[in-house]
Design a protein with these regions (language model features):
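Conserved alpha/beta-hydrolase "acid-adjacent" motif
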Residues: 145-151
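Conserved acidic catalytic loop of the alpha/beta-hydrolase fold
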Residues: 24-42
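Conserved alpha/beta-hydrolase
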Residues: 1-12
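Catalytic active-site module of serine/aspartate enzymes centered on a nucleophile-bearing elbow/loop
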Residues: 162-191
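The alpha/beta-hydrolase serine catalytic core
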Residues: 73, 78-133
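Conserved hydrolase catalytic core segment
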Residues: 40-76
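Catalytic nucleophile-loop/oxyanion-hole region of alpha/beta-hydrolase
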Residues: 12-27
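Short beta-strand/loop motif that positions the catalytic acidic residue
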Residues: 133, 139-141
């Protein structure tokens, strides 16, 4: 099941900007989709911003997530504070306002300040929370400003039931099938 993120650039799903609860509004959408499909428990895989979404799912509905794969997870580093807010204000927000005339840049600014105001770690949960997560996790690190290797590896070190793929896993391209095989094995082992 692929999820079409509400208000994402290049996607079709639209909806209100829930300024006071940006992460939870997306989690509501994710859980609502699973409820609509009659799926109580599920495996989940997310790339990039999917990492913080998965952490929020684990906070809100840990009993429903059987196992999770966090690929190239987003995270915040001290030397790149403001990266997500600034990138989204410069790219996502103007695009959204152009597509949805009822949405203003002021609303986007408030939404993004609430979304990325906790510009630390993985945005949606604390390090103390990660230490308590018993759900099996597979982390596929990256190392670009939006997907910092250090943050991905910190989650692996903190989460008691976590595993990590080789790194780098995308280059050379011959490594990709090995990473895919590891993901498949991980998901099969926890279904």
């Amino acid at each position: 099941i692929s999820f079409d993120l509400r208000n994402a650039t290049g996607r079709e799903s639209t909806g209100p900007l829930e300024i006071d609860r940006p992460w939870d509004s997306h989690t509501d959408d994710q859980l609502g989709l699973m409820d609509h499909l009659g799926i109580d428990k599920f495996l989940v895989m997310g790339f990039c911003i999917g990492g913080p979404f998965i952490w929020n799912l684990l906070k809100r509905a840990p009993e429903r997530v059987i196992a999770a794969v966090l690929a190239q997870p987003s995270g915040s580093r001290p030397e790149a504070r403001g990266l997500f807010y600034n990138n989204n204000m410069n790219n996502w927000a103007p695009n959204l306002c152009a597509r949805q005339p009822g949405v203003t840049m002021d609303q986007c600014e408030k939404f993004l300040k609430n979304m990325y105001g906790n510009d630390d770690f993985v945005f949606t949960v604390s390090r103390d929370f990660v230490k308590t997560v018993q759900t099996p996790l597979l982390v596929m690190p990256d190392d670009v400003p939006a997907h910092p290797y250090a943050v991905a590896m910190e989650t692996v070190m903190l989460a008691p039931n976590s595993e990590v793929t080789m790194f780098p896993w995308k280059e050379p391209k011959e490594r990709v099938p090995i990473a895919v095989r590891q993901v498949r094995s991980f998901l099969r082992a926890h279904r």
